[in-house]
Each structure stands twice: as structure tokens, then as C-alpha cells.
Amino acid sequence: MMEQSLIPQTPVLPLTAQRTVKRALTLLDRHLRETGVAFTSTQAARDWLKLKMAGLEREEFMMLYLNQQNQLIAHETLFAGSISSTEVHPREVVKRALYFNAAAVILAHNHPSGDTTPSQADKTITQRLVQALQLVDIRVPDHLIVGGRQIYSFAEHGLL
């Protein structure tokens, strides 16, 4: 599984705050992996993703792999790009979802600019990913865009 720095080193966040956020992420991650804890809504995923992705300086595409009961199996950053884009490959997305034997995946990426409005490219790749994953019976409950403290939900806007 690919690893990423939990807290980016930035002059905006003091070291003590970075440590606090890192501890919070660890506790939340542990809680989400407990037996019986499920993503019955995407709120838990949103809270976790805000902590995880809000301070990133370049665009990254992440996946949360869920089992049949919507419990978190694993998560990883699949692709990383520049400050304004990242290239996402549907073949790799499907391959990783199958590797984890996921029944569902929550897609997520960040917009370092802070503007969570999806681009046409975001909408197009989301549809391609949903179609590719449907071919192997994997659900996509949501695609979330993190920008600062804001999150855009494709599901809430009827784009899935």
C-alpha cells in the first residue's frame, strides 16, 4: 500500500498542531477499522478526509475501500499530481479495488486552491470510474473533493 505523509510540513501549522492532527487521524483511523463501524453516511469519510487532505500542497487522488457492510478495509493515495491537476487511470483504480476485494469505494481528491467546484475533467473521470467499477460489481457511494475546510459531494449533487 502506498504511504503518504499524514501532515504536510507547512509554515501555517505549528509543529504541535501537526502532532495533534496526526494523533487525531490515528485515532479516527483506528475507530473506523473497528468491527461494526460502518460508513452509513459519508460524514465520517468527510471528517477524516478533511483532516487528511486539507493541507496538501498538490492534488492527490485517494480511495477508501469498503467491504459489503460499508466498513473501511483500507485507504491509499493512488495518484499525485501538480498544484492544479492529477492524472487518474481507471485501470489502476479497478485493479486496486479488486486487490482489496472491495464491495464499494469512496473516491476522493483535493483541490489545493480551496475551490471545491468540480471541473469538467473531474466530472468526466468520475463517470468513467463509476462505469469501470460497475463492470466488476463495485459500488461508488460518493466522490468527494476536499478544498480547505469545504467538501463537495458528487452524490449530493446528483452526479453519480
From Swiss-Prot:
The keyword Hydrolase applies. GO terms for biological process: cellular response to heat; cellular response to reactive oxygen species; cellular stress response to acidic pH; proteolysis. One of its GO terms (molecular function) is metal ion binding. Zn(2+) binds at residues 109, 111, 122. PROSITE patterns: MPN (PS50249), UPF0758 (PS01302). Residues 38-160 form the MPN domain. PANTHER family: DNA REPAIR PROTEIN RADC (PTHR30471), UPF0758 PROTEIN YEES-RELATED (PTHR30471:SF3). It comes from Escherichia coli (strain K12). Gene3D superfamilies: Cytidine Deaminase, domain 2 (3.40.140.10). It comes from the Bacteria. The keyword 4Fe-4S does not apply. The gene is yfjY. Belongs to the UPF0758 family. This is UPF0758 protein YfjY. Keywords: Hydrolase, Metal-binding, Metalloprotease, Protease, Zinc. The lineage of its organism: Bacteria, Pseudomonadati, Pseudomonadota, Gammaproteobacteria, Enterobacterales. A motif (JAMM motif) lies at residues 109-122. Pfam families: RadC. InterPro entries: MPN, RadC_JAB, UPF0758, UPF0758_CS.
